[in-house]
Amino acid sequence: MKRKNMIYFFIFFIFLINLSFSDEKGIFLENPKENLEKISDESEKNIDIKDVKNIRKDNLEKFEKKNFLKKEDKNINERSESKKSENKKNEIPQKDKKIGLALSGGTAKGLAHIGILKVLDEEKVPVEFVTGTSMGSIIAGMYSVGYTPKEIEEIAENMDWMKLFNDKIERRNKGITRNMIEDQNSIVLPLGKKAMPKLPVGVVGGKTASQQLNELFYGAIGTDDFTKFPRKFAAVATDLNSGEGVMITKGSIATAIRASLSLPSIFAPVRSGDRLYIDGGVVRNLPVQDLKVLGADYTIGVNVGDGFVKRDENKMNLIDVITDSSTIAGRQEVERQIRMLDLYMKPDLEKFEAYDFSKVKEIIAAGEKIARDNIDKIRELSNPKLYDELEEKRKEFRKTWTDEYNITSIDIEGNKKYKDSYFKKFLPKKLGNMNRLEMEEIVNEIYQNGNFTTAYYEVKNNKLVINVQEKPSDYVTLNGNINNEDKATINFGFQGNKVLGDINVRYSSNTTVSNEYGINNSVILGIGKDEKVLILGNLDYKRDMIYNQNFGNGYYDFVNKKFSLETGVGFQISKNLLLFAGGGYQTSKVEKNQDQRKNGKKRFPFFETSLTYDTRNSIESPTKGIYFTSKYTFSNSKDANFNALYQTGEVNIPVGEKLTFTPKVSYLTVKGSDIPETYEPKLGGIKTEDNSLEFFGLPADKVRGESIFVGSVKLQYNISKILYADTMYSRAYISDEGFDFGSRKRESYKLGFGVKTPLGPGYFGIAKVPGETLRYILNFGYKPQ
């Protein structure tokens, strides 16, 4: 049941579970010193498992015939003692043994490795070699470059581990043009060959994970040979192309570890040359043989992964069967790796889940406990003299850590569709000494542009290498909305990015299916290296229902069909500030209006200018940021003569960690002798029509006027990252004159609860307008525009 719960958790909430298994055959080195002499020249290379498969096969066969693995940890260590007696003639004196430590993968459970390091350090055990897979590679890597166990513990306690699995860009950092296209996306799937949707290669590209790892190892990323660290290190990853385990000892340590923890379906694979890396736990979750290749005589292994468990067939489902069957060989490989160990430790982590990163102290304590349970064996390995030599070596290496690197050139790798010239706008004009934040800024600017699944940097001598993985050019999108006014709405469409020379093209095509159907197509062309000048085009067709109109002795609904074709020039003054000027042609056809004089079709050209500034962290119930837009439209033609102005602004002010205070004002007005229905101001309900203002407690569109002003104050209490409660007071002034502030007044009081989900926002509340009945509010999904 625990495996089932973990699988469901990560499928629906995009969290991480490390399967921690392998499917490659292991090798027992019965006489490691003799055998390793044959491959000593390979110890500083990236070594595939096939490179060591043929080493002393006769020893392997003899061993497997004579020995079998029992599951109890105690028996494993007893057999290790027996093995040492049998090979006594080849035994190296205890004080001269070179000790290696292998740390397995296991996501949050891998934090138990820190507790074991603390005990080994206290007892002055001179660990000269460390290997790791997945989470184990992070801990092993930190230990190898010179972090002390105490420092690693402090980092683990203060680090936001779940951030590794979230590549989400803050909305304000995307920029206004991306937000115009992407704001209401719920489900986005890339299009493959023949325009067929396909699943992405991973839930996250791994950009944040790479950035966090570069931060941890920044001082040492200039050293590209891991055997030159104070403790020789190797990370283990799986080559997806060949299915082989790969021992990585060269390159960027941050990239090597990122490859080792690339959980299939969670992280996108990492490409390095001809190899495509995924999590090393798929083939070798406990990298013991890699210690022997590095040169270890005595091996300690710490396993925090799962093993074989007895299944109840009545409680199994399809996911359980698929998961278990695909990892059988992997679990067998872990057991084969255990046979190579001299000391095996498996902390008791049954009460912890793979995603329990909030229980850092408890998990570390579990690791410390298993080490103290084996304290007698650990003390036999104590060698204060050699330990002090290693400690001095560690301190000397730490002195070489640097805050800056002298960069003389910048290369882009991984780009195919986007040529090198495309990246010039993101790169500094002058090179020289660069620190981590400056390198991260370059990567962030490239990634925030939205054309790459991941981006990360490496330092190779004096060269800064920016690695990118390009996104597909086209996507299919899907979202929907359910509310108590327009009922159900489904939106589907296409989005994408294209490059035409120096022109970056973003496009969007959406279709709305409901009682109020419509089609919207938008294109944004970025001109020049900095894309400060934009050509914008928009085609819009929609069928709006205008509700609750008073005529004669009752209320009725009618239809306004709008068609608009518009183009213009935009100037991106800053990342979140856009000035637009343009014009187009529009039709407005009114049907079923009880006032027969207003039925009919108007055709007219129009001109429009707008200014928009937007730094909100969300378009629905933001907790911080500013939003302002002002749009002026006019027409002077046979069918239409009007001037219209729409303005709105809000400031979302955080008050402490939980509260957000939001004052907001909106003004909508029109004046002219012949005003199309599209530009007639309306007030009430949830805003879904053109030229309407939201006002809870009133039926949709019930109040009309030539000028409407609404002011409101909202207090939002954020219960968690996804849940909140809010209360709002609003006041409206209505006038029958254009560009006026009227004397007719309406007030609204609202209280409700909201939720933010991957599929869109949800809200339920109640609202009261004096003189109206108490009304409820129900909305799920982005509101149709």
Segment roles from a protein language model:
Residues M1-R3, E37:
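N-terminal secretory signal peptides that target proteins for export/translocation
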Residues R3-D23:
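Classical Sec-dependent N-terminal signal peptides that target proteins to the secretory pathway
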Residues D23-T133, G141-N444, Q448-K460, K471:
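Patatin-like phospholipase
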Residues G106, G136, G243, D279, ...:
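Buried hydrophobic packing residues in well-ordered domains
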Residues A237-D239, T249, P347, G414-K416, ...:
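Flexible glycine-/small-residue-rich
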Residues L437-E438, Y456-E608, Y613-R616, G684-L693, ...:
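Gram-negative/organellar outer-membrane beta-barrel architecture
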Residues Y456, Y475-G480, F607-S720, T727:
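C-terminal outer-membrane beta-barrel translocator/porin domains of Gram-negative envelope proteins
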Residues K714-R746:
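C-terminal hydrophobic structural anchor segments
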